[in-house]
Amino acid sequence: MKTLLLTLVVMTIMCLDLGYTLTCYMNPSGTMVCKEHETMCYQLIVWTFQYRVLYLKGCTSSCPEGNNRACCSTGLCNN
């Protein structure tokens, strides 16, 4: 019984997030931990003059204006 209780305590401590941190995908690759005031991830699709698609990704405090954009508020959701 003590072993089970100790296991539950250890698992709770390991899974407990002591501070809210949002992680988003960024450009050109990889991830970034957002600042405290940045509460959303975004993905913005931009068409270049050569008809190439450019994906801009990162953290933001408000969703960018316009079409071809997506915002979300959970970790790694802007893939």
UniProtKB/Swiss-Prot annotation:
Signal peptide region: 1-21
Cysteine-cysteine disulfides: 24-41, 34-59, 63-71, 72-77
One of the record's GO cellular component terms: extracellular region
Tissue: Expressed by the venom gland.
Keywords noted in UniProt: Disulfide bond, Secreted, Signal, Toxin
Superkingdom of origin organism: Eukaryota
Subcellular location(s) per record: Secreted
Keyword match Ribonucleoprotein: no
InterPro entries per UniProt: Snake_3FTx, Snake_toxin-like_sf
Record has Secreted as a keyword: yes
Gene Ontology MF, one: toxin activity
UniProt record similarity statement: Belongs to the three-finger toxin family. Short-chain subfamily.
Annotated protein name in UniProt: Scutelatoxin
Natural source organism: Oxyuranus scutellatus scutellatus (Australian taipan)
Organism lineage string: Eukaryota, Metazoa, Chordata, Craniata, Vertebrata
